[in-house]
Amino acid sequence: MTIALGKFTKDEKDLFDIMDDWLRRDRFVFVGWSGLLLFPCAYFALGGWFTGTTFVTSWYTHGLASSYLEGCNFLTAAVSTPANSLAHSLLLLWGPEAQGDFTRWCQLGGLWAFVALHGAFALIGFMLRQFELSRSVQLRPYNAIAFSGPIAVFVSVFLIYPLGQSGWFFAPSFGVAAIFRFILFFQGFHNWTLNPFHMMGVAGVLGAALLCAIHGATVENTLFEDGDGANTFRAFNPTQAEETYSMVTANRFWSQIFGVAFSNKRWLHFFMLFVPVTGLWMSALGVVGLALNLRAYDFVSQEIRAAEDPEFETFYTKNILLNEGIRAWMAAQDQPHENLIFPEEVLPRGNAL
């Protein structure tokens, strides 16, 4: 029996090889297999958003004006979520709700579902693009792993949270002021700022900003003076092989400042990757919990004492009262289809009132 070792070569290229050669060709803008998902989905998501914010009203879903055509500006325009009565329908243009009528589809909130789903797949396509390029140039895939953080947040907030609630209606609309309203909603109905997963997310994002500032300043501080240029950008050749700054000097500086410092670049840069990505993932997990209506921290003993003792109040009990006020005011404003009416006597009043 003879075993032949060697690389198998095909006599002629099949369709897959031809497509692979064209998609992965070296060009100004890399396409790749991931581009088949990324570019169409990104085009449709952005196109849907620009169309919605320019022309489409939210009168039939939220009782609001939300387009430039109606007088909104960049901060107040939005592509609004579908009506609560449509629950979790995919709102396909050819589906039973719109029945192929594009105008009706826009009025019902079909553009939101269109933008959300295509946006999610576009983000996934962008992550796959980073995987594909990393593999092509023999890099490790940490860029793609890092980008999983924003994807996790987007999917949890825009898709998983409303799936856990009664419908897409309770997802954020795609607009600046609309996102602000959603944040207030999260605080009032879920006490989001006291949720430990939100705390970890804030620590991750702000900690990452601090790390970036410290790292950038430290590198600038310890640059080798081996160029004739007057500033950082002229003094160094962008293709030079040698290092441009002194890790040893940086280590000594921070050892004197804090008493501790990173001793090697791998651990330093892994930490800069770990902090924000972990923070984003923790936030995403917290939002998944909110989809299931899991509660934040409750300090019931303080609430009971505040109810019994007019002179006892903490920042926590004041925030609980504020949340009740947000719910009482926002529910009626935010869900006009429910015809909610709250009499004056049930509205929250703090000890100071």
Curated annotation (Swiss-Prot):
It is a multi-pass membrane protein. A plastoquinone binds at residues 215, 262. It comes from the Eukaryota. It is found in: Plastid, Chloroplast thylakoid membrane. GO terms for cellular component: chloroplast thylakoid membrane; photosystem II. It catalyses: 2 a plastoquinone + 4 hnu + 2 H2O = 2 a plastoquinol + O2. Chlorophyll a PD2 binds at residue 198. Its EC number is 1.10.3.9. The D1/D2 heterodimer binds P680, chlorophylls that are the primary electron donor of PSII, and subsequent electron acceptors. It shares a non-heme iron and each subunit binds pheophytin, quinone, additional chlorophylls, carotenoids and lipids. There is also a Cl(-1) ion associated with D1 and D2, which is required for oxygen evolution. The PSII complex binds additional chlorophylls, carotenoids and specific lipids. CDD domains: Photosystem-II_D2 (cd09288). Chlorophyll a ChlzD2 binds at residue 118. The keyword Nucleotidyltransferase does not apply. One of its GO terms (molecular function) is oxygen evolving activity. InterPro entries: D1/D2, Photo_II_D1/D2_sf, Photo_RC_L/M, Photo_RC_L/M_CS, PSII_PsbD/D2. It holds the Pfam family Photo_RC. The keyword Protein transport does not apply. Belongs to the reaction center PufL/M/PsbA/D family. PSII is composed of 1 copy each of membrane proteins PsbA, PsbB, PsbC, PsbD, PsbE, PsbF, PsbH, PsbI, PsbJ, PsbK, PsbL, PsbM, PsbT, PsbX, PsbY, PsbZ, Psb30/Ycf12, at least 3 peripheral proteins of the oxygen-evolving complex and a large number of cofactors. It forms dimeric complexes. PANTHER family: PHOTOSYSTEM II D2 PROTEIN, PHOTOSYSTEM II PROTEIN D1. Photosystem II (PSII) is a light-driven water:plastoquinone oxidoreductase that uses light energy to abstract electrons from H(2)O, generating O(2) and a proton gradient subsequently used for ATP formation. It consists of a core antenna complex that captures photons, and an electron transfer chain that converts photonic excitation into a charge separation. The D1/D2 (PsbA/PsbD) reaction center heterodimer binds P680, the primary electron donor of PSII as well as several subsequent electron acceptors. D2 is needed for assembly of a stable PSII complex. This is Photosystem II D2 protein. The lineage of its organism: Eukaryota, Viridiplantae, Streptophyta, Embryophyta, Tracheophyta.
